[in-house]
Amino acid sequence: MATGDVKGCIRKLEQRLRTLNYPRDVDYTGLIKGDPSASLPIISYTFTCYSTSIAEILISFGIELTTKSDLRFIEAVYKVLRDVFNYKPILTKQQFLQCAFSERKIQIICDIVDCVVKKHKEITGQNKVKSQLVKKVVSAKDQCEVFYPEDVSVQPSVKTTQKKPLVERHAGSEFLLPTKCYSSALVEDIEEEEPTSDSEGGSHLEHEMESPFETAETTPNSEQIELLRKQLAECQEKLQRLDCVEQRLQSLETSMKGKIIIDETDWNNLLSRVLLLETEGLLQSKKTDFSVPSEFACISEQRTSSRMTNEICSNLKTKADIPESHHQSSGYSFVLSADTSPIAIDINYSSLTEDSNETTKQRMERITKMMEETSKLLKCSNNT
């Protein structure tokens, strides 16, 4: 179809939207392109927001049009058009969701708006007729009061039938003077002559009927007043408690200035670390104490070795002064004396090493005992 048809369809759609009082902005470019995202909001507004009676009909059929995807929404709309309005669209569901068929989509939207508006008018017209019938019945019962005065006979005369009953309306009320109503025709004449006055009287009656309820609502009961008093007392108590809490907080802040708060776990960790550092310091001091006697032992060994060498030299000198004959006779003894000196040195050194080994063993035992004691102390601190 030509572009002029698209413009004409858009004009028709604008007219329908005016009848709906559509408050949102319309994406005309999307409608011309055939974008379904431009037409779906209009359809959802016509079904859900325009008329409450239409929404009630949809609920009665068990159809929901909100919180759905585009495909589910179109399926529900086609179901409503088929079941409620007996309307079959030109396009299929898949074609409607495509970005094409702009003129046909606009025509479908216009048809949907027409169907909804027509249905709304039908429902509102039926409701108006029902309300008017109810009002007529009520007004006929209230207005017509048949009475028979004492002076007048029960059978009416011809003159009285020709005269119309006198009706006097008081402002703000529906009370009538006593009238003579002899037939239903007279009642119909009264209703036809004074429709406006009936509507005004009905409004006054409604106002009067509403006013006592309003006064009853505005005047609170004694129970409500007592409840309010109790609530006020509770609020005052809570405010006093809050004041006490604020005072305590201020006192705590003043007392805790310059102080640091630490968790128990962190404090225990710090204590354990301090104990470890102290034990390490003690062990290092004891190691230094152990190293001092070892130095003394080395010095003593050096002194003993120097003494032994001096003695050997002195012995050699004395033996050189002895004559050869004496050397021959006592050569065996010289050899023995020469051989015995290193043996004595070895014996002295072995005794020293044994003493040093014993002292190191004792020291190691002491160190192990100290380590065990420190580990026990650490376990006790962690448990506490």
UniProtKB/Swiss-Prot annotation:
GO MF = microtubule binding
Q: Where is the composition biased (Basic and acidic residues)?
A: 201-210
Keyword annotations from UniProtKB, A to Z: Coiled coil, Cytoplasm, Cytoskeleton
Q: Where is this region: Disordered?
A: 191-222
Chain intervals for the UniProt region annotation (Binds with microtubules and centrioles): 11-188
Gene Ontology CC annotations of this record: centriole; centrosome; cytoplasm; midbody; spindle pole
Q: Name one Pfam family in it.
A: CEP44
The regions listed as transmembrane in this protein's record are none
Chief location category: cytoplasm
Gene Ontology process terms (BP): centriole replication; centriole-centriole cohesion; centrosome cycle
Q: Where is this gene product found?
A: Cytoplasm, Cytoskeleton, Microtubule organizing center, Centrosome; Cytoplasm, Cytoskeleton, Microtubule organizing center, Centrosome, Centriole; Cytoplasm, Cytoskeleton, Spindle pole; Midbody
Coiled coil, from the record = 221-260, 353-378
- Please give the subunit comment from the record: Binds to centriolar microtubules.
Its annotated function is as follows: Centriole-enriched microtubule-binding protein involved in centriole biogenesis. In collaboration with CEP295 and POC1B, is required for the centriole-to-centrosome conversion by ensuring the formation of bona fide centriole wall. Functions as a linker component that maintains centrosome cohesion. Associates with CROCC and regulates its stability and localization to the centrosome.
The protein here is known as Centrosomal protein of 44 kDa
Protein source organism? Xenopus laevis (African clawed frog)
Origin organism lineage: Eukaryota, Metazoa, Chordata, Craniata, Vertebrata
